[in-house]
Amino acid sequence: MSGRPNNPMLHAALWYAELGYSAFPCAPGRKTPLTEHGLLEATTDTEQITTWWTQHPDANIAVRTDGLVVIDIDGEGNAWLADDTAKQADLGIAPQSLTPRGGRHYFFRQPDSHAWRNTAGRLAPHVDTRANGGYVLVAPSVVEGKPYSWQAEHELSMPPQRLPEPPAWLIEQLEALAASNGIVADGTPGNAIPTGQRNETLARLAGAMRRVGMSQAEIFAALQQVNADRCTPPLPLREV
């Protein structure tokens, strides 16, 4: 990066953009976007990024998470992860960002034909997800006087398309949450559930929804929508 101004935030923002992550500036020390349209202005354009961080050299760096799913675990010792070594190992394949309050961000890419959005506390208490329509701050951004940083040996070093997919059990739970929010599918052929897979897929989704604490009524309502939107053709109601 020789020849660039001696500005650590600018250098980092350009590095993320060169990897393929769309960035935009947030207020120094905060998570609030500095640009009028926030994440909608996220870009990999190096000229625009240079302009932003030349004007606001201390601005934090936000990365748009469309096409990604970032598992946002709040605080140290979160019960969802602390005592589960298998889960820790599964998540450990992903780049990991350490947050100022002792939490972690695990960076995955969304599998093909999925279209997940953000969730807050739905996966587990104090566990959020950032996906389509979301963003996260990245190192070396600073909040409350403390920086974000990359976990040693788990730094972000690959473009978005080379990030790992979530483990299978996590995909099931995220799909279940998407179903409960009415945002499972975008209607593309890749999201269709063909004859021969409908019952098995709905049963799998029902089990995943149950594991994330949804009620029987919520599960039934979500399955009806999945059946109507994705099953080709839809199953009779009595089979849902």
Predicted regions and their residues:
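Signature for HUH/AEP ssDNA processing cores
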Residues: M1-G102, P111, A192-N199, M214-F220
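Charged, low-complexity surface segments at secondary-structure and domain boundaries
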Residues: M1-G3, P33-L40, L68-V70, Y148-L163, ...
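Modules that initiate DNA replication and primer synthesis
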Residues: S2-R4, A17, S22-P25, D112, ...
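Generic, low-specificity signal for short hydrophobic/alpha-helical stretches with a mild N-terminal bias
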Residues: W53, A120, A152, G187-T188, ...
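Metal-dependent DNA replication initiation modules
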Residues: P57, I61, G77-E175, F220-V240
